[in-house]
């Protein structure tokens, strides 16, 4: 159900989800399918279009969760399978693994999918739920809560037409802040992020695939330089280059041709290919990276989910993976709390998920390939945390309502 009926200026529901990305939509969908009434409120007038956005890597456990939601066919049709990682150092191969090598993984590949495609697939499923209401063009501006419920106040966003009420109140048993790093709902409940910025930027270029290469994530680490090549739909590749400090200014000024020249020593085949397809690449984009945490994942009846409460380096696509898995954990906790009347399940959401997410953050923060260290790499960039990404602790699997630690 989707509505902008001005008569609905006051709503009561089991769960109110604030946000409009894949994390918010997925959490709302799980709650609705579990039998709860759900109101999702997005501050923007429109959701991201299918095919739009970046194409992060969805890991096998996340794909298993999304497949159970009925959107597997859409994701597979629009996405690109990634079979594993080959990681090269200055003296040769540091590590090589495939998802299929990890015993028990039901789905032996990751999938890079445009974020807009995931959003639209989840949105269609959510709108089909009889107890779900989707509202757009309204920003959260107030929150009040007691032991029984939380009341959220919304205002019509600038530029919205009169079909949306100027103000609206939604009373819910629980609320979910899934509105991203700049979360308005998180700010309203008084939670501030603790941000740690990586001191090393990188530069992104999207180009057609080098012919004949296997669909794996390639890492070439020639300290302090590092090159990451990620298969994306197209077929194309996202080329992420972290140069030495003294190469950065030249890269800012030189664009794709300069990037191709700089990587010649690290990946001569790709360098030559970029020269061949120079008119078919994207512009070069500078990327900055950071991690962020929050001192608490919950304030009373408001739960913080996804990038509203944690952020990771883009390496391996773990930001979206952990956000979607967090939405599943939160939805399960809310369902148990509503069914039993016992808020202990809400406390378990943070207790079980938080150590897993922060372990990934710590591994990324200390990863040699993401810094300016000049010592030759002795381990693959993904080697230390492939198991953390794919083999989930049993208690976390139970919270996700899965049946296998390597779903």
Swiss-Prot record:
Disruption phenotype: Mutant does not produce asukamycin and accumulates protoasukamycin. Its cofactor is FMN; FAD; riboflavin. Keywords: Antibiotic biosynthesis, FAD, Flavoprotein, FMN, Monooxygenase, NAD, Oxidoreductase. SUPFAM superfamilies: FAD/NAD(P)-binding domain (SSF51905). PANTHER family: 3-(3-HYDROXY-PHENYL)PROPIONATE/3-HYDROXYCINNAMIC ACID HYDROXYLASE, BLR0106 PROTEIN. Involved in the biosynthesis of the antibiotic asukamycin. Catalyzes the conversion of protoasukamycin to 4-hydroxyprotoasukamycin. Can also convert some protoasukamycin derivatives into their corresponding 4-hydroxyprotoasukamycin derivatives. Can also use NADPH, but catalytic efficiency is 50-fold higher with NADH. This is Protoasukamycin 4-monooxygenase. It comes from Streptomyces nodosus subsp. asukaensis. The lineage of its organism: Bacteria, Bacillati, Actinomycetota, Actinomycetes, Kitasatosporales. The gene is asuE1.
